[in-house]
UniProtKB/Swiss-Prot annotation:
Any GO CC annotation of this UniProt entry: cytoplasm
Keywords associated with the record: Carbohydrate metabolism, Cytoplasm, Isomerase, Metal-binding, Zinc
Enzyme class name: isomerase
Gene Ontology MF: a single term: carbohydrate derivative binding
Keyword set includes Metal-binding: yes
Protein name per Swiss-Prot or TrEMBL: Phosphoheptose isomerase
Function: Catalyzes the isomerization of sedoheptulose 7-phosphate in D-glycero-D-manno-heptose 7-phosphate.
Length: 197
């Protein structure tokens, strides 16, 4: 297969995965946006975490809320727990990498805040501990997962929301995660500030 054929194949795989995910995920994304808007209207904030590409997604979500998405609007309170290398390496060195997010959540999280927890497998130990810490702090969890939801899915409470991408390929799951994040940002803006039609 030549390179351009491979590129077309990858584009088509991404399109197919998004098409399959659209109807499955729409109600979950809607519910997650409502949970987030309710938190923001009640003086809550968004915390987000993930590893690797999912850390990038956590930061992307946080920056869209803090700065802007596609319209001018006031900044919204959001903290990506993936950005402070001194804190992360300190916790990893003194305790364990599994606690790099949970310790931050125990310090920063308040009842009514929302944790956006991102893992393509749903099995990242530090994300699982982050969810447990969020529940201890009476936070609501929005989980972006893939495959079978992993250990994260079994930890979620009735008030939590799982957005599970119906795919098994990490790259395809990540692509849908980013689209879901953009949908969340759009829905948050429209619910808080009105539609821009």
């Amino acid at each position: 297969m030549d390179m351009q054929s491979r590129i077309r194949q990858l584009f088509q795989a991404s399109i197919d995965t998004k098409q399959q995910a659209m109807d499955v995920l729409a109600p979950h994304i809607e519910q997650a946006s409502q949970v987030m808007v309710n938190a923001l209207l009640n003086e809550g904030k968004m915390l987000s975490c993930g590893n690797g590409g999912s850390a990038g997604d956590a930061q992307h979500f946080s920056s869209e809320l803090l700065n802007r998405f596609e319209r001018e609007r006031p900044s919204l309170p959001a903290i990506a727990l993936t950005t402070d290398s001194s804190t992360i390496t300190s916790i990893a060195n003194d305790y364990s990498y599994n606690e790099v997010f949970s310790k931050q959540i125990r310090a920063l999280g308040q009842p009514g805040d929302v944790l956006l927890a991102i893992s393509t497998s749903g099995n990242s130990a530090n994300i699982i501990q982050a969810i447990q810490a969020a529940h201890d702090r009476e936070m609501i969890v929005v989980a972006l997962t893939g495959r079978d939801g992993g250990g994260m899915a079994s930890l979620l409470l009735p008030e939590d929301v799982e957005i599970r991408v119906p795919a098994n390929v990490t790259a395809r799951i990540q692509e849908v995660h980013l689209l879901a994040i953009h949908c969340l940002c759009d829905l948050i803006d429209s619910q808080l500030f009105g539609s821009e039609e």
